[in-house]
């Protein structure tokens, strides 16, 4: 349902912008960069109520499709969608608990998380007359965790974020450097224990795109 709302919101924005004189472009983009994630897992078992924290930096390469309205003064409003998952990080650890069988939760635990269903609403604000512009954007995405716990699972959670950057347009081609910061998230396990995870992520990326 939230994905449908995102699509409808983006569509309404573009329809509104199209009613003003503008050049509508479809295109593809490619990006690469780094995503940094700081996460903390809080154990909720009787044998262990400790916190475990970890910071992970992942290099990523991706692609997107977009539609945008380019106005006569260079101001641009658009929507992009990344049809691939972006890995936020992964790791593992070996748990060795006490001898109490009721509280024993031994074994290797693995964890990973991806950003999926990634939409961005953005605007390009011209700076001068040489094609340079400021970039502002707002992200809509879903965090999909994959964690191995005995009889427990973590569900997906929706996350939003903002983006700022600088770019340069040359005809239908653009290159831009942007920083993204995502809101803090909290996920509680369901099933065998009451573990919870909190995380914060940000990203720095270089993107090249071409419109048709």
Model-derived features with residue positions:
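Cleavable N-terminal export/targeting peptides
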Residues: 1-25, 212
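Residues on the lipid-exposed face of transmembrane beta-strands in outer-membrane beta-barrel proteins
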Residues: 30, 61-69, 79, 121-127, ...
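Outer-membrane beta-barrel translocator domains and adjoining extracellular loop/strand segments
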Residues: 38-51, 87-100, 141-158, 185-196
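Residues that define the transmembrane beta-barrel architecture of outer-membrane proteins
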Residues: 53-63, 113-119, 153-162, 169-171, ...
